């Protein structure tokens, strides 16, 4: 007995849908690297296609089927893959399986293990970051498909609030003055001690478009994010390490806006070889310690726009 293709029938309400698909789909992926051991990931996929108003539903099983096929093919081939290239292949396969689709999108998130050493005692530990890839394809009326891809990372760090620190410094000046210290002595004292403030766990994200013929190193993105906050966080810290991390962060206080702007500047400097119309997304979220809310800053732009703004500021 042949089953009817219910998905291909007309819906009761004839309205198109922008994105239909599956989320929270996990697969084991092994990526090849030149002259290095393979990277094994357990990414979470989100895959979508659009749906015309004339069709009741997408053929839902085809989307996870596409991921399975692409992942299996990677294991058999000798080519070197990046997560962004994996996403592009999935997008192209989605168009093959969903012939009615004019748009297809893939998002990939995965934990990424990094070897770290504590800053003073040099103890080895494993740190976890998150790598992200996105591919988005559009098919025109002639069947031509244009796909854009992005790659990025999300890293946790520490930030120290400049505002509270400045207020405590002013309070210290008043207190020391009342106790009879001279202005010269107060300046020496404040230069010799670390002024307290409240901290945040910062979460920095950078996504960069990868034009055809270009590469964008995830390790470079991770370094940019780490270097743009008040300091790094570590899984393993002995007492001397902990003192170093806290003091270093308090000597480098930053607002959430400072972190975002620092990432922007570093992206423009490090990836100066990318075309000027390359898309860049920078986001910083700081988990507040003395508030119930979080602080947020973001910029979505092109390399050209960011470079021009930075040039204007330096002239």
Swiss-Prot record:
E.C. code: 3.5.4.39
User: Quick one: which pathway?
Assistant: Cofactor biosynthesis; 5,6,7,8-tetrahydromethanopterin biosynthesis
Q: Which GO terms describe its molecular function?
A: GTP cyclohydrolase I activity; GTP cyclohydrolase IV activity; iron ion binding
Residues annotated as site: May be catalytically important: 161
Question: What cofactor does this one take?
Answer: Fe(2+)
- Among its keywords, does the record have GTP-binding? no
List the PANTHER family hit by this protein, alphabetically.
Answer: GTP CYCLOHYDROLASE MPTA (PTHR36445:SF1)
On assembly, the entry states: Homodimer.
Q: What does this protein do?
A: Converts GTP to 7,8-dihydro-D-neopterin 2',3'-cyclic phosphate, the first intermediate in the biosynthesis of coenzyme methanopterin.
Family affiliation: Belongs to the GTP cyclohydrolase IV family.
Name of the protein:
GTP cyclohydrolase MptA
Tell me the organism: Methanococcus maripaludis (strain DSM 14266 / JCM 13030 / NBRC 101832 / S2 / LL)
Q: Which gene encodes it?
A: mptA
């Amino acid at each position: 007995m042949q089953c009817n293709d219910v998905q291909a029938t007309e819906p009761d309400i004839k309205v198109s849908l922008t994105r239909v698909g599956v989320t929270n789909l996990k697969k084991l992926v092994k990526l090849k690297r030149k002259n290095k051991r393979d990277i094994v990931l357990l990414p979470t996929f989100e895959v979508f296609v659009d749906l015309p108003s004339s069709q009741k539903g997408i053929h839902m099983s085809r989307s996870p089927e596409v991921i399975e096929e692409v992942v299996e093919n990677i294991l058999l081939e000798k080519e070197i893959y990046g997560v962004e290239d994996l996403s592009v292949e999935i997008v192209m396969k989605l168009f093959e399986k969903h012939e009615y689709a004019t748009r297809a999108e893939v998002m990939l998130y995965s934990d990424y293990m990094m070897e770290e050493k504590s800053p003073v005692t040099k103890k080895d530990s494993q740190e976890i970051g998150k790598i992200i890839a996105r591919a988005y394809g559009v098919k025109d009326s002639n069947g031509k498909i244009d796909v854009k891809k992005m790659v990025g990372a999300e890293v946790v760090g520490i930030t120290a609030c400049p505002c509270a620190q400045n207020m405590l410094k002013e309070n210290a000046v008043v207190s020391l003055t009342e106790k009879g210290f001279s202005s010269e002595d107060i300046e020496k004292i404040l230069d010799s001690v670390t002024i307290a403030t409240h901290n945040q766990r910062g979460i920095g994200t950078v996504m960069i478009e990868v034009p055809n013929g270009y590469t964008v190193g995830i390790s470079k993105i991770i370094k940019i994010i780490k270097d743009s906050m008040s300091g790094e966080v570590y899984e393993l810290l002995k007492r001397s390490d902990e003192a170093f991390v806290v003091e270093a962060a308090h000597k480098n206080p930053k607002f959430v806006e400072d972190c975002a702007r620092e990432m922007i500047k570093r992206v423009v400097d490090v990836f100066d070889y990318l075309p000027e119309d390359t898309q860049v997304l920078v986001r910083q979220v700081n988990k507040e310690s003395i508030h119930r809310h979080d602080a947020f800053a973001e910029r979505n732009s092109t390399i050209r726009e960011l470079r021009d703004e930075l040039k204007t500021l330096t002239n």
